Amino acid sequence: RQMCIRDSLYTSYLNKQSGKTNTISCKKKDVLGLPYESYIANRDVVLSGFKIAKEFLLRDQCVFRQRDLPYTTQLIPLAAICAVLGKSKCNEPNTIKTLSRWYWCGILGEMYGGANETRYAYDIEDMVEEVNGRPNAMHTINSAVFSSTRLLTLQTRLSAAYKGIMALLYKEKCRDFMNNTTIDIVNSMLESPDIHHIFPEAYCEKMGIKRERYNSIINKTPILPATNRSIGGNAPSEYLGAILKKVDGLTENELQARVESHFINYAELKADDFNGYFIDRAKSLLNLIEKAMNKPVTDRDAENTLD
């Protein structure tokens, strides 16, 4: 179904550009009414757009596995946009920058969760115009909003924004605490990183920390299975010490650098200072989100809103 919508979107865009129609539309009636001749004529170009989009996700956005893809629906306009622009244009730094901002605004603003056909039509026109330096409404970018309090309610990978924030950590080259692995396409396939608590759940329950806080994305990060086993249910001060003893030649300065590559305050983690660590990491994640969206987060004072 998504392939049919993508093909219809691309064809509708071309028809508007050539003056055959006045609007871009890829609703059910448009998909059903797509002429076979148009489908055949555009098939190879649309397929190439999908391949370009896949490369954009792998190379530029650090989305390596299907399970980590925030929205499958956003692939529809992305592939159609890439088909219109072509591979050479899509590989230009300015195009990557423009598409990246649109991509992250769509994910972090959680814009693709419902009926999206109208948004797809806006997206293909807006992004092609923006890449080519022409005025446009930038509907998705301008509509996207991320509130700091959303961090507390991001509890599972069912949310697109949850997956998106984890991909942003991959983009920043976060390193595994024990073996120093950075998560790239090769390592993600070979070693299967997953998302785990930084202050372990068992420890937080014992200390009376609210589940709303310890189970939020603020207290989670991607690590490898061996590291997660070393963490167990122990206090951070205990598992950091255990990792230092277990890994030959690992200095505390190096462990600190690895931990801080996840935007975690090492001193607060080592001191088992959940509250201080929690606020600092929330602020760091909000900085990361603002950087990706290139626009401010609402309710930015995390220390007040995330207590």
Residue ranges and their predicted role:
Residues 1-5:
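Short, small-residue-biased leader/transition segments that mark boundaries at the very start
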Residues 213-214, 231-260:
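Polybasic, low-complexity binding patches
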Residues 252-307:
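C-terminal, well-folded lobe of enzymatic/effector domains
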